[in-house]
Amino acid sequence: MDVLRPQIVTFDGRNYRKNPIQEKQYQHEEDEDFYPDSMEYSDEPCGAYEVAQTPHGFRATVSAPSLLYKHIVGKRGDTKKKIEVETKTSINIPKHGHEGEIVITGQHRNGVVSARTRIDVLLDTFRRRQPFTHFLSFFLNEVEVQERFLMFQEEVLRKCSKDRGVDSTIFQNPKKLHLTIGMLVLLSEQEIQQTCEILQRCKEEFINDISGGRPLEVEMAGIEYMNDDPAMVDVLYAKVHMKDGSNRLQELVDRVLERFQSLGLIVKEWTSVKLHATVMNTLLRKDPNAEGRYNLYTADGKYIFKERESFDGRNILKTFENFYFGSLRLNSIHISQRFTVDSFGNYASCGHVDFS
């Protein structure tokens, strides 16, 4: 790691320097014992914490979903005790299954700040290990598009079914066609509500200006593939663009992405959203409920490898290069929940903002 360019971790809009760590591995250890002696953090945040002075010293609070409490406690309470001893503070964590704030108290302000920083870094570390739970999206499942998609599937199977790896199992469910803006880890109802509020602020600050307070008229037309070799395709997608040829949809989704990245809610992997709708995905071959490259973690956040069999997409790309899937009016950004289905067969929406 370059010490002059350390990893920066963002919490609540503030940036912190994260020093390198050395993890020791022990047989049969669980993740909650993650706090080896060799771990060190820069205890002073780059921004200011809200630390209240009390008659007995100083106090700070940390908001965190109950699912992550165990990582602050550690096995037999070792992690919590270690932080308390080294920072000369007392840390009160809500009981398992109860939502609330983690409260840090101590005689010295620096100690409280140090404990708060260590807890924040631990929370960020283990949040990053959680599987994605939700995603920001546009629904692309209007009736015309579903019908045209089924026509595309029928024609592909009629003309290209003899090509290696091409069969009916790798086509997307037409009711679940969508455009993803970014993936989220939301671990409580409070975090879902906060995400709804952020979307609402986006609407007030720039979505209304970009959309003009009206639905965006778009078309799904043309196909493209994700990887470098058209003879070994894993994901084939339909392209999405504005009917009027403008860049408004791209500008809108990029601004939303930037806002969520700046708040630490979406990992900064890209600076721009690739406008696409997946129509064929080889992960679906063995698991109809698979959700693309994001379906790579178990329920407890452990990485897994999914073997996938690619398909030869050369004939499909040549024959259906400009296939027209239909036009749509995009009027809402949804907070979609993974592995769920609503009454229309789409992903369940936990909240949304409308353009009009």
UniProtKB/Swiss-Prot annotation:
KH domain: residues covered: 57-119
Region (Required for interaction with ASCC3): 1-52
UniProt entry tagged with the keyword Transport: no
GO biological process: DNA alkylation repair; regulation of DNA-templated transcription
Gene Ontology CC terms: DNA repair complex; nuclear speck; nucleus; transcription regulator complex
Molecular function GO terms recorded: RNA binding
Tissue distribution: Expressed in the spinal cord, brain, paraspinal ganglia, thyroid, and submandibular glands.
Function of the protein: Plays a role in DNA damage repair as component of the ASCC complex. Part of the ASC-1 complex that enhances NF-kappa-B, SRF and AP1 transactivation. In cells responding to gastrin-activated paracrine signals, it is involved in the induction of SERPINB2 expression by gastrin. May also play a role in the development of neuromuscular junction.
Protein name (database record): Activating signal cointegrator 1 complex subunit 1
Gene from which the chain derives: Ascc1
